[in-house]
C-alpha cells in the first residue's frame, strides 16, 4: 500500500506514537542537539543522511531519499528493509493508520 491509500493522519495520535516509539532516540525541537538518532526538525524535504552534525552509517548516507509523505510511509513500515545497513534499530510500524498519524505529527512538528 502507499501513503495515498492510507487513512488521513491524526497529528495528536501521531504525537503519542512519537513519544512512545521515537522520542527516546529523536527530538523534533528546533535547535536541539542530536540524540541516539538525528534531530528530525526540518526533516520534510531534506535528503536522508544529511542532518548537520549527525554521524550516519554509510548506508544512510548512500540512500539519498528525499523525505516526504511517500518516502516516510515506506521507510516507517520497515526501516531496515528500506535502508539496509541503517543504524536505526526501530522495527517499524505495521499499521497504515499508525504511519499516517506519525507522519501527520512529524509534518506539523518539524516544519
Curated annotation (Swiss-Prot):
- Where are the N-acetylserine modifications? 1
Q: Which GO terms describe its cellular component?
A: mitochondrial intermembrane space
Gene3D superfamilies, per database record: Cytochrome c-like domain
Keyword list (alphabetical) reads: Acetylation, Electron transport, Heme, Iron, Metal-binding, Methylation, Mitochondrion, Respiratory chain, Transport
Superkingdom of this entry's organism?
Eukaryota
UniProt PTM:
Binds 1 heme c group covalently per subunit.
What residue ranges carry the coiled-coil annotation? none
Which locations, inside or outside the cell, does it occupy?
Answer: Mitochondrion intermembrane space
Pfam families reported in the protein's UniProt record = Cytochrom_C
Residues passing through the membrane, by range:
none
Q: Report the residues modified as N6,N6,N6-trimethyllysine.
A: 80
Q: Which Gene Ontology MF annotations are present?
A: electron transfer activity; heme binding; metal ion binding
Alphabetical list of PROSITE patterns matching this protein: CYTC
Per the record, the major location class is: mitochondrion
Q: What does the UniProt function comment say about this protein?
A: Electron carrier protein. The oxidized form of the cytochrome c heme group can accept an electron from the heme group of the cytochrome c1 subunit of cytochrome reductase. Cytochrome c then transfers this electron to the cytochrome oxidase complex, the final protein carrier in the mitochondrial electron-transport chain.
Q: Which family does it belong to?
A: Belongs to the cytochrome c family.
What name does the UniProt record give this protein?
Cytochrome c
The organism is: Ulva intestinalis (Hollow green nori)
The opening ranks of the lineage are: Eukaryota, Viridiplantae, Chlorophyta, Ulvophyceae, OUU clade
Amino acid at each position: 500500500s502507499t501513503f495515498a491509500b492510507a487513512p488521513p493522519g491524526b497529528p495528536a495520535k501521531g504525537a503519542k506514537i512519537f513519544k512512545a516509539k521515537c522520542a527516546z532516540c529523536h527530538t523534533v525541537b528546533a535547535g536541539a542537539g542530536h540524540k541516539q538518532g538525528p534531530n528530525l526538525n526540518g526533516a520534510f524535504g531534506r535528503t536522508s543522511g544529511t542532518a548537520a552534525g549527525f554521524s550516519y552509517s554509510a548506508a544512510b548516507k548512500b540512500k539519498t531519499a528525499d523525505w516526504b509523505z511517500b518516502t516516510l510511509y515506506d521507510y516507517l513500515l520497515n526501516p531496515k528493509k528500506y535502508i539496509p545497513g541503517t543504524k536505526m534499530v526501530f522495527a517499524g510500524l505495521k499499521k497504515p493508520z499508525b504511519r499516517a498519524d506519525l507522519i501527520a505529527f512529524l509534518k506539523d512538528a518539524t516544519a
